[in-house]
Amino acid sequence: MKQKLLALVCALALVVSLAGCVISTPDTVGSLGDYEISSGLYLLAQYDAYQKAADLASSDQDAANVNAFLKQTITVDSDSGETATVSDYVARKTLENLQTYAATELRFDELGGQLTAEEEQQADSYAQQLMDQYGDTYKANGIGLETVQHFERILLKSNDLLTLVYGNGGETPVSDADLTEHLENNMVELAYYVIPLYNTSTYAFADDDQKAQMLTLAQQAATAVNLASNESASEQVSALNAAAQAALPDIYAVLGSTPSDTNVQTELLGSSTLDSTFTQSGSADTIRNLAYGQAAAVQYSSYAMMLALRVDPLSVSSLDDLRDQVITDMKTSELKTALSDYGASLENHLDTSAMNKLPMTKIVNK
């Protein structure tokens, strides 16, 4: 009997000791300045940092094998050749992400920012869409809907900060003169037609000879626009439309297809968007160097070309109508740097023991 009782006591003691060793997920991992970091936001920052590392993986590295990949080395700067172990890179980027989140929220509050009900609804709606699409991955990494909603609000606050800092009545407003100069020298308003370099029925791609033939026909249409004497933007766009409607049937016929009923499109592009859209060699510079009222035809990607006309943006919209877009193009990089510096200056009260309960080795990357 004594032996059985002793065994029972030992078993109970073991259960108690094991219960005392259960590792629970912390609610927070500490703070940066006065900004408390939830465990969910920490896991999101860490997962995003891992994805950045995965994007830098070489062809012979498998980011899906998390434990192995964390021990490997990646090139983090192709220009300088700087390298880092993945685990160190993920740790650094996780902290940088958290600092940016904290800086965004703190600066937003300092400047009296307030999300509108519409913005909050937008954040919640997009967060739900992300969970619908990627919920299994998020949940596997400890990231729930509430965290994604929080993150979407941070993104909206970051966007609103552009107005709170640089807009009319902002902390350091940009003058109309500076906005106009940036608009005229760094942004491009286009009226354009996109022409696919494939048969729209069979999806057979054009060969080099067919591309050259299609581009020649489109350039002839651009020349017709440039030879017309049109003063106003509306007259210039009308000339583009007329030239396009005359040329498109022959252009599409090269591939045995017919044009759709697409009307002329218009868009104001910033410099970075121009470069990321016009990826074929020289195409971005061709568009950037157009004078107001001048047209050109370029192959802008591997699958499409464009018949485009540059228009004076202030002839179709007022500066007030374009203010937010110009500020975004002009000041996004500056704001990003300012938030990074602000975040790095915050006192670090992150709890190492809490973060150790959320190790990067537990990341699921399928």
Which functions belong to the PLM regions below?
Residues 220-280, 321:
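Peptidyl-prolyl cis-trans isomerase
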Residues 16-20:
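C-terminal motif of bacterial Sec signal peptides marking the signal peptidase cleavage site
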Residues 23-143:
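N-terminal targeting/tethering segments
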Residues 1-7, 12:
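Positively charged n-region of N-terminal signal peptides that target proteins for export
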Residues 28-32, 80-95, 104-114, 143-148, ...:
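Second-shell loop/turn segments in exported
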Residues 25, 32, 138-216, 273-366:
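PPIase-associated folding chaperone regions across multiple families
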Residues 21-27, 242, 292:
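A short, compositionally biased
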